[in-house]
């Protein structure tokens, strides 16, 4: 199949979250399955700084944005054997952040990603690549299905092209003032309750949900959760109405990129058959972060975005009780400034028992996965989650709230003794989190039982292959629905 994946961030070029990992890994697996898959993303300042070897493909056709005409340029690079197109438009994308500063989103994000949607549709005929499916991701590409139904409706180039919108996180909805319709020069007929209108605002994500041929999200449990009022972020009605076209496909991880046997960031390699190197990584992590070097102390870690979704309120409320249990606690992450400030203060109070590192550091993240005994994800909601999959691969036992993709990948001995690979809790409370941790700590004190759990986690197959095969199945179904 001819597949174009459009995303606002793609690892390793630009990343703020899990979307980038998916957008970088899935196309490579689709390519290995024999499909002609290509990627398109904006050319951000951070991408320029990498001095990639890019080929200039020419000027973009003029893109009309309301009363203004915007121009841009098109570049081509590659990710392994997958072509990657970069849309250059310096007024929109030559900035320090992808979406904003640590305090605020950029005020012109509607224009920026409106341009990205229009620009990618203008670019493909110029490139001469006619996709059977446009795989769109999150609100940043949400306008594309609406544009295809209006501005491009009569264009023969896209006559047979189906669309799929993947929801990586329903909490990010691309909400903008109603006047955005005029600012971007969108067809006013789109601004209805059945279209882009959402409580007197415009929602880019809603456009993707309403107008795409198919919707997917990143785990089966999250797919069910978002059709409920409690978890639907106001879109449960739309999603329930489109349930016949809504599917959950679990994300994978790139098992070549995440492999403790050959990860260059680790002090010592190790494997499911030889766990000895894991202890050396724990020792190095303790030393590097200024923690007491003790092989026996349970080392509990988090690599996370510092946002309310991630259950950091539970960690903050349980901080002293966590430390009273004798664990060492390591947190690496960046995000909301108030969380960063509060956790920096907490981390400084017990420097030999806790370490909080703000920002993102890939080498340190890898050492954390390898050196930790337990990996904590107490998320209020978690569409899929990649952290628990990497933790399992690296033999770090996940302690997670049973929601979304966490419920689909982490199995508690109380529920599934033969498949157990971690510990789960359901209630959103510090006491429920601590109870799950206490069960983990009890098993940690039984070395043979603990090793068995660690090994079972490391043996799990969370590679992209099965997910990619499922996506191909759904791409074909989307094309059928488009032609029906």
Swiss-Prot record:
Signal peptide: none annotated. Keywords: Glycogen biosynthesis, Glycosyltransferase, Transferase. It comes from Syntrophotalea carbinolica (strain DSM 2380 / NBRC 103641 / GraBd1) (Pelobacter carbinolicus). InterPro entries: Glyco_trans_1 (IPR001296), GS/SS (IPR011835), Starch_synth_cat_dom (IPR013534). GO terms for biological process: glycogen biosynthetic process. Synthesizes alpha-1,4-glucan chains using ADP-glucose. ADP-alpha-D-glucose binds at residue 15. CDD domains: GT5_Glycogen_synthase_DULL1-like. This is Glycogen synthase. The lineage of its organism: Bacteria, Pseudomonadati, Thermodesulfobacteriota, Desulfuromonadia, Desulfuromonadales.
């Amino acid at each position: 199949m001819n597949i174009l994946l459009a995303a606002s961030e793609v690892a390793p070029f630009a990343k703020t979250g899990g979307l980038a990992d998916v957008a970088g890994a899935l196309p490579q697996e689709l390519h290995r399955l024999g499909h002609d898959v290509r990627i398109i993303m904006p050319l951000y300042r951070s991408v320029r700084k990498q001095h990639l070897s890019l080929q200039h493909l020419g000027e973009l056709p003029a893109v009309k944005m309301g009363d203004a005409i915007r121009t841009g340029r098109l570049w081509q690079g590659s990710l392994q054997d997958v072509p990657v197109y970069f849309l250059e438009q310096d007024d929109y994308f030559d900035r320090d952040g992808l979406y904003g500063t640590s305090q605020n989103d950029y005020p012109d994000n509607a224009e920026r990603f409106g341009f990205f949607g229009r620009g990618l549709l203008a670019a493909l005929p110029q490139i001469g690549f006619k996709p059977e499916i446009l795989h769109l991701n999150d609100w940043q590409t949400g306008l594309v299905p609406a544009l295809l139904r209006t501005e491009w409706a009569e264009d023969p180039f896209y006559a047979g092209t189906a669309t799929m919108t993947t929801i990586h996180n329903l909490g990010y909805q691309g909400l903008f003032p109603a006047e955005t319709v005029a600012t971007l020069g969108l067809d006013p007929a789109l601004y209805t309750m059945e279209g882009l209108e959402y409580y007197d605002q415009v929602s880019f994500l809603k456009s993707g949900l309403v107008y795409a041929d198919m919707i997917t999200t990143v785990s089966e449990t999250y797919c069910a959760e978002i059709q409920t009022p409690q978890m639907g972020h106001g879109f449960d009605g739309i999603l329930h109405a489109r349930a016949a076209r809504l599917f959950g496909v679990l994300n994978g991880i790139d098992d070549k990129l995440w492999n403790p046997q050959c990860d260059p960031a680790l002090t010592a390699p190790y494997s499911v058959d030889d766990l000895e190197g894991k202890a050396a990584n724990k020792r190095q992590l303790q030393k590097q972060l200024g923690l007491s070097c003790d092989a026996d102390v349970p080392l509990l870690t988090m690599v996370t975005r510092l946002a309310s979704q991630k259950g950091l309120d539970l960690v903050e409320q349980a901080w002293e009780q966590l430390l009273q249990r004798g664990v060492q606690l390591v947190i690496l992450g960046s995000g909301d400034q108030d969380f960063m400030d509060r956790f920096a203060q907490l981390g400084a109070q017990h420097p030999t028992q806790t370490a909080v590192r703000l920002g993102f550091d890939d080498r340190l993240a890898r050492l954390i996965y390898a050196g930790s005994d337990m990996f904590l994800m107490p998320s209020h909601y978690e569409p899929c989650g990649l952290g628990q999959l990497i933790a399992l691969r690296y033999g770090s036992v996940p302690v997670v709230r049973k929601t979304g993709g966490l419920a689909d990948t982490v199995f508690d001995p109380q529920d599934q003794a033969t498949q157990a690979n971690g510990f789960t809790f359901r209630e959103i409370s510090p006491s429920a989190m601590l109870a799950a941790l206490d069960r983990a700590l009890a098993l940690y004190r039984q070395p043979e039982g603990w090793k068995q759990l660690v090994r079972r986690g490391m043996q799990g197959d969370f590679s992209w292959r099965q997910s990619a095969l499922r996506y191909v199945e759904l791409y074909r179904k989307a094309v059928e629905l488009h032609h029906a």
